[in-house]
């Protein structure tokens, strides 16, 4: 049990170093760009799917 506490403590120290070091700001900027990129791609593929959809197959 003490080993798990030590592992999580080390992970917390590493996360704090990244968070307080300014890396989080850069990662948030990249995440915003990726969000809008994938949102635009979703809308494009949605429109393509609605336009290109054919009727039901013949029986």
UniProtKB/Swiss-Prot annotation:
InterPro entries assigned: DUF1328
Membrane-crossing residue ranges in chain numbering: 5-25, 30-50
Membrane topology term: Multi-pass membrane protein
Localization in the cell: Cell membrane
Keyword terms, alphabetized: Cell membrane, Membrane, Transmembrane, Transmembrane helix
Keyword Transmembrane helix: yes
Major subcellular site: membrane
GO cellular component: plasma membrane
HAMAP family xref list: UPF0391
Entry-linked NCBIfam families: PRK13682.1-1, PRK13682.1-4, PRK13682.2-4
Family statement: Belongs to the UPF0391 family.
Protein name per its UniProtKB record: UPF0391 membrane protein lpl2443
């Amino acid at each position: 049990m003490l080993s798990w506490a030590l592992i999580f403590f080390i992970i917390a120290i590493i996360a704090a170093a990244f968070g307080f070091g300014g890396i989080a700001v850069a990662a948030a900027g990249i995440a915003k760009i990726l969000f809008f990129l994938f949102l635009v791609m979703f809308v494009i593929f949605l429109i393509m799917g609605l336009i290109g959809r054919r009727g039901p197959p013949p029986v």
